[in-house]
Amino acid sequence: MITVATAECFTLGKIGTTIHKIASGYEECKNHRYYNIINGNVKIISSSFIPSIEGAEKLLNLGAPLPKCDYEYSYSKAYTEKNDLKVAHILAKGLKNSLNCNIAIATTAGVGRGGICIISDKNEYLFTTDIEGDLISKKNIIQRQKNGIDKTINKFVEILKKEYFL
């Protein structure tokens, strides 16, 4: 069984929840296009929505502080796209090290297309959504979120096929 963990910000835990529901055989997911790949082969060992720096640092035992936010925004992390990519990588690495899972997925997005990182047992994948968004002004954040969820799950399944031969 391939173990998976997520640390999500702008995707609000929906990647981990979706994978969990498919993996667990929820009735509503039995017709999902990836059901036959995920169900019976994958299990979620942790799925977290972590919007704050403090939460990420404490939960994931990062060992070093995350970068200072590029933007002031309530209590959530808010970075440029460049720093979102760095932070997503740090979060995924912390998650993989803390939980010793096969695949760690992390997402974060402030201003720009956001940052997504998937770390498998063999490789690291760092990418963005296809949608420019702005957490501060709330511009395109729902569209960016949906795109990020879809793109990440598609990439996750691509990794399962390529690296785990499913």
Swiss-Prot record:
Name of protein: UPF0254 protein Maeo_0668
What would be one Pfam family of this protein?
HcgF
UniProt xrefs under NCBIfam families: PRK00962.1
Segments crossing the lipid bilayer: none
Task: Please report which protein family the annotation says this sequence is part of.
Answer: Belongs to the UPF0254 family.
- Supply the InterPro entries for this chain: HcgF (IPR009625)
